[in-house]
Amino acid sequence: MNYISTRGASPALPFDRVMVSGLAPDGGLYMPETWPQLTADEVRAVATRTYPEAALQVLKRFSGEAIPLPDLYTAIIRAYGRFDAADVTPLRRMGDGLHLLELFHGPTFAFKDVALQLLGRLMDWGLTRENARALIVGATSGDTGSAAIEGLRGLDRVGVVIMHPHGRTSDIQRKQMTTVLDDNVRNIAVEGNFDDTQRILKDLLGDQELSQRLHLAAVNSINWARIAPQIVYYITTAAKLGAPDREVDFAVPTGNFGDIFAGYAAQKMGAFKGRLIVATNENDILARALATGRYAIGEVFETTSPSMDIQVSSNFERLMFEASGRDGALVSRLMGDLKSHKAFDLPPGMRARIAETFDAERVTKDEAADQMSETARDTGYILDPHTAIGLVAARRRQRPGVPMVALATAHPAKFPAAVAAATGSAPPVPPRLAALETLPERYDTLPAETHAIRAYIEAFAAR
């Protein structure tokens, strides 16, 4: 299995090389050269497998011959052994045909653990095999950073530098990162928003001289090895609900389009048919793009769902590549327009193909709060604000006779202020999160300028 760039002008790479890469040299994102396929019987069989067994069956199709199966399975077992749910991503029934997929049972209480606990182990395996080192750089709107740090802390062959927007995460999200004092980890509070951190990250990874000299790699969802493990829970969930013999719909709270693209990838593998619902907050570039065909960067609004306070959705480029018939030149031109003019128009054919699978719903913070209050009152179940957005979208788009799954992406204790404001009481706090209150923090505050971050990273690499 090789991987090609969405912009069509970079050499193909195997999985193990993509795993420790950032952007392709032409600025694009790596994608599978072809989509591996599951037969109907293989999908049905997933419903009876353990989660690690299902993960092996899916992920071996993406790693190909790059990772021996015993090594891949060992990494999977170790990664998901740290989750506090036996089935890793439990499915909870919320009503007639409506379900929540709980993705927050990992060590940092967010869905990012599903991918990053595994990615950390696979990176360590690959670097040890090659007797190599890597400097991981990441940008986080809240959850990616802590999950990446938890998966990579203490590794001898890996340095980690994570940028977060200063003052724009919850206190707990910040402390999950900044209280980690391992020598191989550094945190930067960037004086800007998440889109600024993501722009800087792409500048750094796009600098081929810097990337090669410092052996830079990414843990954001621009890295295909971040997307691949998330495909697994779409397949296991769809199989439990009757796929491929019935349709299953998913509503996904998303800002950067990575999680929902994993659902699309599962569909491309033949795992299930159904609608994919993009659930956005007031930062609604994806909802606007799907409704009007115009992808235009607007102002970033601060909301109670900070992990979705994003205007530039990096993984949308992957969908554009697929919906254009894998026309790398067209994707490159449109992304050039975005960089130059902060907007582009989806060609009619591309827009029509996207509409075959995707719908979108914009959910305000007040609507999310109402859903949190209603769910707590009626069921006793506590939602975090991101999950509430997904549940609102799911209820709006639920079809008769078709199972609808809303993704529960974070534990409510990560957002105590929003939960308390909506429900009247703070959520119970797991001991691991409560302990953060008394721990010292370490981070550096820098301007939202690539040159400043570059100098910091070079100094860290030279230590």
Mark where each language-model region is.
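PLP-dependent amino-acid enzyme catalytic core
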Residues: 1-463
